[in-house]
Amino acid sequence: MPLFQNATFFTTVNHLRDLPPTSAEIAFVGRSNAGKSSAINALANRTRLAYVSKTPGRTQHINFFRLASHFDYFLVDLPGYGYAEVPESVRAHWVELLGRYLQTRESLIGLLLIMDARHPLKELDMRMLDFFRMRGQPVHILLSKSDKMNRQEQNKTLATVRQALAGYPQVSIQLFSSSKKQGLEQVETVVAGWFAGLEARQADELTDGEPDDRTPDPDSAS
């Protein structure tokens, strides 16, 4: 089964105290209306798993989606940033919720940062990269809506973004289109690698914690 296929909605939370216990999470983040929810739907091969709106700022909570292929693994749709047409109190709550989640969530193992390919590397995108870099975890950038550009424009944008982020070794980048189903396999390969890395680290920790059977028994030496 493909990694994301048949993912299901699990829960939505508005406060960190309500976050569910999970083994591993991959979070989707980006500017409002960059295409986060559309990306989740395309990857899961579902049309209405994550709510898609033409109005920016509709994702106001943290939404969890459980992977059918790995029951303890989750996709997380975070509130979009950069949308000004909401009350200041609401925007302040989003900022606190998003920031504290990214800083403190122990089960978060990687970030999928969605940027509109026609308008990448906005100031808030760069702030997000700098903020998350402190965790030392990988970020994979999806240059969404790339189908709105011709091939020459796509290649130029991809090269420009790669050059601009050369100083971010934990970042990888690709073109992506939810509507045309382009780039899905590449995203799946990247995220599967993150999960495999987590499982390898967990296996190493278990091995390190086991007693060494080769250690001689002091009583047998007498």
UniProtKB/Swiss-Prot annotation:
Residues 201-222 are annotated as: Disordered. Mg(2+) binds at residues 37, 59. One of its GO terms (cellular component) is cytosol. It comes from the Bacteria. GO terms for molecular function: GTP binding; metal ion binding. Its cofactor is Mg(2+). GO terms for biological process: division septum assembly. Residues 212-222 have a biased composition (Basic and acidic residues). Keywords: Cell cycle, Cell division, GTP-binding, Magnesium, Metal-binding, Nucleotide-binding, Septation. Gene3D superfamilies: P-loop containing nucleotide triphosphate hydrolases. NCBIfam families: GTPase_YsxC. Necessary for normal cell division and for the maintenance of normal septation. This is Probable GTP-binding protein EngB. It comes from Laribacter hongkongensis (strain HLHK9). The gene is engB.
